[in-house]
Regions:
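Short, compositionally biased
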Residues: 2-88, 120-121, 146-149, 164, ...
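Active-site microenvironments of metalloenzymes and redox enzymes
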Residues: 36-38, 51-157, 201-205
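Surface-exposed recognition segments
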Residues: 43-48, 148-149, 174, 191-266, ...
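A glycine-anchored, Pro-Gly-centered beta-turn/N-cap motif
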Residues: 53, 194, 324-327
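Short, flexible loop/turn segments at beta-strand junctions in immunoglobulin-like
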Residues: 59, 117, 180, 320-322
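Non-cytosolic beta-sheet module surface loops
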Residues: 74, 147, 157, 190, ...
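Short, well-ordered junction/capping motifs at the entry into regular secondary structure
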Residues: 109-116, 163-192, 218-219, 245
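C-terminal outer-membrane/trafficking sorting elements
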Residues: 271-348
Length: 348
């Protein structure tokens, strides 16, 4: 029982401090089966039944404040490593994030507005840093429709656009602060209007999409990425829940944002609390990770709850020489996307 309680504490702690997006800002979207698409529109047909696992989705689009925090910790305007290394994360904007003497910050008055001018690569990088990912197109549509509630509204939360969306009739063609319209039935805001939102999928016709009907991820390649939800200058007809558009992953606009999704962490298959994974423990200078698996990512959180390391490791060891004494939380992600968590004591 004691180990189980520790597991819950560690899961919550990891969720709270990595990327500063706490579970209280996430909505659990319970898995289920729904009808995806709309046979009335060629880009949205054919309809098909899709089954999704449970996931968490952020209540709001990622804000300028949150994205600025990421940039200051990440320390680069381009992707630093991996297959997308060198890709631009975002472009500065007077409605978005600006650089002030070397520090990124939200434009004055736009702190709680959706982060904009972010490329798909930037949205993907933020989500990974925050311990999550972008939603698939199927997850996005399912959540916008209210998940297992299976609402039949035209828009996300209502068939009256003005109740739930900023769009052509009421926005004045400017972005609005997140969460200022009514949420849908599961507590998600702004899934219709305000800004389009990136999805993880490459864009393709549904008829050509060979993804499975369970947790589909879209085509394996393409030239543009899916965006969903409509934006503040669309007419109401372009805000319907199955409407889909696409743009190049390198592009960024002042009407395109994104939101975070996290997988559900369960003791059985997602995260283990390990007591002998790190050696030596207590540590002074270097730490070895005792695993035969290749390490995909390592995050270290200091005693104050701040993320102080977020990177890959080489040869399964890393240096803690620059860290003050204290108890740290170490989260290790292997190439099978399984996470392990252990406390590390630094004592010199």
């Amino acid at each position: 029982m004691k180990k189980y309680h520790l597991l819950i504490v560690l899961i919550l702690l990891v969720s709270v401090v990595i990327g500063q997006v706490p579970l209280s800002d996430m909505i659990e979207v319970k898995g289920g089966t729904f009808s995806m698409g709309n046979s009335s529109f060629s880009r949205e047909s054919p309809t098909r039944n899709v089954t999704l696992s449970t996931f968490y989705m952020s209540k709001h689009a990622v804000t300028n404040v949150q994205f600025a925090e990421f940039l200051n910790i990440y320390g680069s305007q381009t992707v630093k490593e991996g297959e997308f290394a060198g890709k631009l994360l975002f472009r500065e904007d007077s409605w978005g994030v600006e650089n002030n003497n070397g520090t990124w910050q939200a434009a004055a008055g736009f702190e709680q507005f959706p982060a904009i001018k972010v490329t798909w690569y930037g949205a993907e990088a933020y989500c990974k840093w925050a311990g999550g990912r972008l939603p698939t197109e199927a997850e996005w549509e399912y959540a916008a429709k209210g998940g297992i509630n299976k609402n039949t509204y035209v828009y996300s939360g209502s068939s009256t656009a003005s109740l739930v969306a900023w769009f052509y009739d009421n926005s004045g063609h400017t972005n609005k602060q997140v969460g200022t319209k009514t949420a849908n039935s599961i507590g998600l805001f702004d899934m219709s209007g305000n800004v389009y939102e990136w999805c993880s999928d490459w864009f393709g016709r549904y008829g050509d999409n060979l993804s499975p009907s369970a947790d589909p991820t879209g085509p394996t390649s393409g030239v543009s990425k899916v965006i969903r939800g409509g934006y503040r200058s669309n007419g109401a007809s372009d805000l319907h829940l199955t409407h889909r558009e696409s743009i190049s992953p390198d592009e960024s606009y002042n009407f395109t944002g994104f939101r975070l999704v996290r997988n559900v962490l369960t003791p059985a298959n997602q995260i283990d609390v390990i007591e002998n994974l790190l050696f030596p423990n207590p540590a002074k200078e270097y730490v070895t990770i005792h695993t035969a698996d290749e390490i995909k990512n390592l995050k270290i959180i200091n005693p104050e709850g701040k993320l102080v390391f977020d990177n890959n490791v080489i040869n399964n060891f890393f240096s803690v020489a620059g860290f003050p004494n204290g108890i740290y939380l170490v989260r290790i992600l292997n190439n099978s996307d399984k996470a392990f968590v252990q406390k590390l004591l630094i004592d010199r």
